[in-house]
């Protein structure tokens, strides 16, 4: 129901409001804007993608990761199945697929076999107001992922990059050749209203969701894109933690 979605949204907004109030004196600094963007991203990850256990980790020893959390993708899979039983769930997906030289078992089979465990998520936020992300930022993200995630955990961890801008063609080509599950989220920055307050309702939204080729193969038929496109998060209710 819509009220469940709105209720979840208001649960996330107090953290943003508290941060703004505590740091009003430096509200136009780069550091403030970066932290505010991270709180905004956390809100969208929780509300739109149902990620849980989200926490900010930014700091001198964060290893390049701004947010860590957990993603029970199976919740979305089963919720779509119950809300839209006529939505075709492909049954002819191979048990294993090859992507850029790696053999992958789609998460769907872990879900239906009841062996799935929530994915770990590593999130990096780039609150660039003018410039678009370049391939360099993604190469650095790959370095962060490989330094923090062992080979055996590669398909149990998803790397997420967030920024307010669309990707360039060159950057798209690059990330589709990256041999790890990478998701790009275009999330707006919060807009300041004429009264000086930030618009927590109509800005700071998740605009685009994009899986690279590796993530798309791994998450084949999990229906995340459909979940977002149909705005099914407005009609579902989850526990806040899992």
From Swiss-Prot:
InterPro entries: RRG7 (IPR018828). One of its GO terms (cellular component) is mitochondrion. It is found in: Mitochondrion. Disruption phenotype: Impaired respiratory growth and sensitivity to 4-(N-(S-glutathionylacetyl)amino) phenylarsenoxide (GSAO). Keywords: Mitochondrion. Pfam families: RRG7. It comes from the Eukaryota. Present with 1420 molecules/cell in log phase SD medium. Belongs to the RRG7 family. This is Required for respiratory growth protein 7, mitochondrial. The gene is RRG7.
């Amino acid at each position: 129901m819509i009220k469940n979605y709105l209720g979840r949204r208001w649960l996330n907004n107090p953290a943003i409001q508290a941060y703004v109030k505590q740091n009003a004196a430096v509200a136009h600094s780069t550091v403030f804007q970066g932290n505010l963007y991270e709180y905004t991203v956390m809100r969208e990850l929780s509300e739109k993608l149902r990620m849980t256990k989200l926490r900010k980790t930014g700091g001198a020893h964060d290893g390049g990761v701004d947010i860590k959390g957990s993603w029970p993708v199976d919740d979305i899979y089963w919720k779509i199945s119950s809300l839209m039983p006529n939505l075709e769930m492909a049954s002819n997906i191979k048990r294993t697929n090859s992507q850029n030289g790696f053999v992958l078992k789609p998460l769907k089979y872990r879900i239906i076999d009841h062996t799935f465990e929530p994915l770990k998520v590593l999130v990096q936020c780039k609150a660039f107001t003018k410039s678009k992300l370049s391939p360099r930022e993604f190469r650095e993200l790959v370095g962060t992922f490989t330094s923090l995630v062992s080979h055996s955990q590669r398909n149990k961890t998803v790397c997420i990059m967030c920024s307010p801008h669309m990707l360039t063609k060159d950057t798209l080509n690059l990330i589709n050749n990256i041999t790890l599950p990478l998701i790009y989220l275009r999330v707006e920055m919060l807009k300041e209203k004429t009264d000086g307050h930030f618009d927590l309702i109509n800005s700071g939204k998740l605009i685009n969701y994009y899986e690279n080729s590796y993530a798309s193969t791994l998450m084949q038929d999990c229906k995340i894109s459909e979940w977002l496109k149909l705005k099914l998060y407005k009609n579902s209710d989850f526990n806040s933690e899992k």
